[in-house]
């Protein structure tokens, strides 16, 4: 798995909405998951240290994946278990690509682009994990922190010849229902599509 220099990744980073038919490998997905929510150590209080900064090490996010095309992995909905660095298969979803069109509101500037990616990352947040410490300020911190996560997805994708595109406009109710989130205590806050770049 070749990796570009950090300088090149930052300079070449663009939102990518056109993907090739090539699939991501499991090794590449593993790398992207590590880059966005991977654990790099523990502090003296037993809190996880990760590849992204997070206010007070509260880590309010969970990573769900809608996998369309990935080498050696069946299509479906998965959850990333960061402590174990493992994927948990949740369930298959009938008409997954059509559901992704509906979730992403069939973005008019590039129709159906998300369904053509290899994988759609969906980050959920459980605000209370930060609210107990920061009260109402937690909401601002959560929004900043999810930006760190998605930027790492962009840079890590770039480093392996893939491209990412963040998606901030989506059908909130539908995606929360699909992932069996209550939409109150836990809800999706950001999406990111990733696929191999088209030449």
What are these regions (language model features)?
Residues 32, 63, 121-129, 138-177:
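Small-aliphatic-rich amphipathic alpha-helix that forms the alpha element of a beta-alpha
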Residues 88, 92, 187-199:
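C-terminal helix-cap and adjacent tail motif
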Residues 77-79, 120-122, 191-193:
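Conserved hydrophobic/aromatic beta-strand scaffold that supports enzyme active sites
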Residues 14-23, 132-143, 160:
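Short histidine-centered catalytic/ligand-binding loop motif
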Residues 177-184:
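Short proline/glycine-enriched turn/loop segments at secondary-structure junctions
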Residues 1-116:
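N-terminal amphipathic, basic helical "cap/leader" segment at the start of enzyme domains
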Residues 94-146:
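A mid-sequence, solvent-exposed acidic-amphipathic segment
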């Amino acid at each position: 798995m070749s990796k570009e220099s950090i300088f090149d990744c930052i300079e070449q980073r663009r939102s990518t909405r056109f993907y090739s038919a090539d699939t991501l490998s499991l090794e590449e997905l593993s790398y992207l998951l590590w880059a966005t929510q991977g654990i790099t150590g523990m502090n003296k209080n037993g809190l996880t240290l990760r590849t992204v900064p997070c206010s007070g090490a509260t880590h309010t996010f969970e990573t769900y994946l809608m996998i369309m095309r990935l080498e050696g992995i069946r299509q479906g909905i998965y959850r990333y278990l960061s402590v174990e660095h493992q994927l948990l298969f949740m369930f298959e979803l009938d008409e997954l690509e059509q559901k992704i069109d509906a979730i992403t509101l069939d973005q008019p500037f590039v129709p159906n682009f998300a369904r053509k990616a290899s994988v759609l990352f969906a980050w959920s947040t459980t605000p209370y994990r930060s609210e107990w410490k920061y009260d109402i300020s937690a909401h601002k911190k959560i929004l900043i922190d999810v930006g760190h996560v998605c930027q790492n997805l962009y840079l890590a994708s770039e480093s392996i010849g893939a491209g990412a595109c963040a998606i901030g406009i989506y059908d909130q109710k539908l995606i929360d229902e699909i992932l069996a989130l209550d939409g109150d205590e836990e809800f999706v806050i950001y999406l990111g599509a990733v696929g191999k770049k088209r030449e």
